[in-house]
């Protein structure tokens, strides 16, 4: 396998890691939508019903997550998402899952980077994320949930017409 994105070499750094990594070619998705990803990835809770776990009555149950387990081992834990606190129930889930810190649009506090729909554009929010990680003083676990994979796929003006259009709306 030459790249993560089939015949297109769009992720050269990640591709360079493949020869030094354990790669799983056959995997199973534990959800179909973004709202289902956070519980699946951080707490091993797959989507088993038509209602995402975060929105279900089961979200009130006690459960362990990477954040809660690592917190017990002395790690600081944080979650970053450029949207508002109420978006997709992430803030409530993160508190219940044991994340010590939550950073979103309100914590970023600079509306000039707002995409007009979801929250802060990914590029400036990734820079904010990197700055916060550099401030960590002890072992840490952090999760970043980006906004760019959601319609209407807003692109900052400085990046318009910079890339060739692809086959899907997200590639335009």
What are the residue ranges of the model-derived segments?
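Solvent-exposed soluble domains appended to multi-pass membrane proteins
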Residues: 1-172
């Amino acid at each position: 396998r030459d790249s993560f994105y089939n015949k297109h070499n769009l992720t050269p750094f990640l591709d360079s890691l493949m020869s030094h990594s354990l790669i799983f070619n056959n995997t199973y998705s534990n959800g179909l939508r973004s709202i289902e990803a956070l519980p699946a990835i951080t707490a091993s809770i797959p989507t088993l019903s038509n209602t995402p776990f975060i929105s279900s009555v089961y979200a009130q149950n006690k459960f362990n997550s990477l954040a809660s387990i690592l917190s017990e081992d002395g790690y600081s834990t944080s979650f970053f998402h450029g949207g508002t606190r109420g978006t997709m129930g992430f803030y409530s889930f993160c508190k219940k899952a044991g994340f010590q810190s939550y950073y979103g649009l309100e914590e970023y506090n600079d509306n000039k980077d707002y995409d007009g729909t979801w929250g802060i554009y990914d590029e400036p929010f990734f820079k904010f994320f990197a700055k916060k990680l550099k401030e960590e003083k002890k072992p840490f676990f952090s999760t970043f949930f980006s906004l760019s994979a959601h319609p209407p796929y807003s692109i900052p003006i400085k990046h318009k017409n910079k890339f060739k259009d692809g086959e899907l709306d997200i590639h335009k």
